[in-house]
Regions:
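Conserved small-residue
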Residues: 6-9, 88
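A short alpha-helix capping/helix-coil boundary motif
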Residues: 9-11, 28, 122-123
């Protein structure tokens, strides 16, 4: 597998370089369960990946050794009153690997949980919604050094033109 790696045993001389780094075998599974009760819909999804490549001491990988090992999503779509519905999504993710911060320290990814919610008002020819992502303002890094946004909201509408 071609990857960007850094050999930290070289200390200050360590540089990122693109190399044919490793052979990686992956195995995984993905499953989901859906349930509809009256007009309410519930769904649980889970995926798992295992790679047999062990992380080498002193080698920091940019891509090959970082992957999402566990992902669990629990969703509910609930009608509240006529035309108004609530969608809730809970996501738990556990990523394997590490990233290098601006000071040069190697940090391992931490599992995190995020909850999103969406209120939708739907008519025959139009719908409007307001959505809150990362509802509980969780601080996390999903990939690399990039810190993901805290709580944020969006709103929108759509028209159906015959």
């Amino acid at each position: 597998m071609i990857d960007w790696i850094m050999d930290t045993s070289k200390g200050e001389e360590a540089e990122w370089q693109s190399v044919n780094h490793a052979t990686v075998n992956s195995i995984g599974l993905e499953t989901d369960l859906q349930l509809t009760i009256h007009r309410s819909k519930f769904k649980v999804s889970y995926s798992y990946i295992h790679q047999d490549k062990e992380q080498e001491v002193g080698i920091v990988s940019q891509y090959a050794l970082e992957y999402l090992r566990h992902k669990l999503v629990v969703s509910a779509h609930l009608p509240l009153i006529k035309h108004l519905s609530l969608g809730l999504d809970y996501r738990w993710q556990d990523r394997v690997g590490s990233y290098t911060d601006f000071e040069g320290s190697v940090n391992h990814y931490k599992p995190y949980m995020v909850t999103d919610a969406r209120l939708t008002w739907q008519q025959t020819k139009w719908k409007a919604y307001i959505e809150a992502n990362n509802l509980f303002d969780v601080s996390y890094r999903d990939y690399g050094l990039v810190e993901q946004p805290g709580r944020w909201m969006i709103a929108g509408c759509s028209l159906r033109i015959p």
